[in-house]
């Protein structure tokens, strides 16, 4: 059974539009979790393809300063994975949600319960950056009969054989990491990045999205030329925190309506 996230993003790709997925940190709002659906609605109204929802954690190894600080602000409001899932169960969203979490909160929650409770939300994808592919069976047996896709991350340093291993049988989309390091770094792209992304996109039979360091309209244009779309995190998180909702809406609208 093809999962909803795969079909949804593939339909956008087939329509010759760029896929645009913004990242937000759950609980990083003046109203805490009570503001979560306000942010989701703002992004939905701007035409996003899906929304990545970050789970705050005390040791976010893949996060740069902006997202790490957002997580700290959320944790200071006593936001937990349990509270986030309960909030997401309150109503369905217009677009699929993708949870980005580290493995520890999932382990503490209970893997089977985690997947079961997520099934009662609009979450259709799951990203766990500190879960190596070799240990994916930690959670895949529970996801197999669900409509939640485990999204693989492919970095610049991933060898060809391992790339194929990660891509073959993957669901949802391929998360192509544009920089070596944490989120939020901008501009320090390798010379062979475009070729790397083009090769990934040509090989994969599901959409390939470029993330980490994507922050400008020029980035959106560049990466839509060599992949199927982009994920934007740090810029969105920073601008929302700074109260720049109109600027966020304009940027997201540009990315979400980008014609190939």
From Swiss-Prot:
The keyword Calcium does not apply. The active site is at 52 (proton acceptor), 63 (proton acceptor). It holds the Pfam family Trp_syntA. Its EC number is 4.2.1.20. It comes from Streptococcus thermophilus (strain ATCC BAA-491 / LMD-9). PROSITE patterns: TRP_SYNTHASE_ALPHA. This is Tryptophan synthase alpha chain. Belongs to the TrpA family. GO terms for molecular function: tryptophan synthase activity. GO terms for cellular component: cytosol. The alpha subunit is responsible for the aldol cleavage of indoleglycerol phosphate to indole and glyceraldehyde 3-phosphate. It catalyses: (1S,2R)-1-C-(indol-3-yl)glycerol 3-phosphate + L-serine = D-glyceraldehyde 3-phosphate + L-tryptophan + H2O. Tetramer of two alpha and two beta chains. Keywords: Amino-acid biosynthesis, Aromatic amino acid biosynthesis, Lyase, Tryptophan biosynthesis. NCBIfam families: trpA (TIGR00262). Pathway: Amino-acid biosynthesis; L-tryptophan biosynthesis; L-tryptophan from chorismate: step 5/5.
């Amino acid at each position: 059974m093809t999962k909803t996230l795969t079909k949804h993003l593939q339909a956008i790709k087939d329509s010759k539009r760029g896929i645009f997925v913004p990242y937000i940190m759950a609980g990083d709002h003046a109203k805490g979790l009570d503001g979560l659906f306000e942010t989701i609605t703002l992004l939905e109204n701007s035409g996003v393809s899906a929304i990545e929802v970050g789970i705050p954690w005390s040791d976010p190894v893949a996060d740069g300063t902006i997202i790490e600080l957002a997580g700290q602000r959320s944790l200071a409001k006593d936001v937990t994975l349990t509270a986030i899932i309960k909030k997401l169960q309150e109503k369905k969203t217009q677009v699929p949600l993708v949870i980005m979490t580290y493995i520890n909160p999932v382990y503490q929650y209970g893997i089977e319960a985690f997947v079961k409770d997520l099934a009662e939300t609009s979450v259709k994808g799951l990203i766990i950056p500190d879960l190596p592919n070799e240990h994916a069976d930690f959670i895949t047996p529970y996801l197999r009969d669900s409509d939640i896709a485990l999204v693989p991350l492919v970095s610049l340093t991933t060898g060809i054989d391992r790339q194929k291993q990660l891509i073959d049988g993957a669901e949802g989309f391929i998360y192509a990491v544009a920089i070596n390091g944490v989120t939020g770094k901008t501009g320090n792209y390798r010379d062979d990045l475009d070729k790397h992304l083009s090769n990934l996109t040509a090989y994969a039979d599901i959409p390939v999205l470029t993330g980490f360091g994507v922050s400008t309209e020029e980035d959106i244009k560049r990466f839509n030329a060599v992949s199927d779309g982009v994920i934007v995190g740090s810029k969105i998180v920073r601008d929302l925190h700074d109260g720049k909702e109109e600027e966020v809406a304009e940027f997201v609208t540009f990315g979400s309506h980008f014609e190939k």
